[in-house]
Amino acid sequence: ITDAEALVRHGQMNCISWIIGHMANQEQTYWLLLGQDKLLHPNLNSLVGTGKPASTPPLAEMLDVWYSVTNETDDYLQTVIPELLQTHFVYKGQSRPESIGTMLYRNIYHYWFHTGEAHAIRQMLGHTDLPQFVGNMQAAVYKPEV
């Protein structure tokens, strides 16, 4: 998509650049702030957080934010073992209501929701020959834990 296309809002739908920033915001909140007490982009939630006013942030900026956040969160998520999934983060002295495993599910489902939204936006923009699957389905096969 072009920079201009990334800012297009159709009715109440978010724009693609917002979606990218919004996903970075959830990962930053879950895996950096709650998981490690780190905050790379302190103003991100006010720009693209749930329930905040609609915004159309620049695509390049949101991609930079997303890459910086996901690089940090990937390092953290590599340390999450099955036993941790049933535990809860403690933030500011309070145990979070959802387990880490539930938060991981929520993060995955959230990506799928907004991936679908971005796909619909691209269709509305007139893009053709869009992918039918995310990733290489031949190589993405289930492998049981050892």
Name each model-derived stretch.
Residues 3-49, 91-146:
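Short, contiguous alpha-helical
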Residues 2-6, 82-85:
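Short, flexible helix-adjacent loops and helix caps
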Residues 51-91, 98-113:
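Acidic/histidine-rich alpha-helical segments that form the ligand environment
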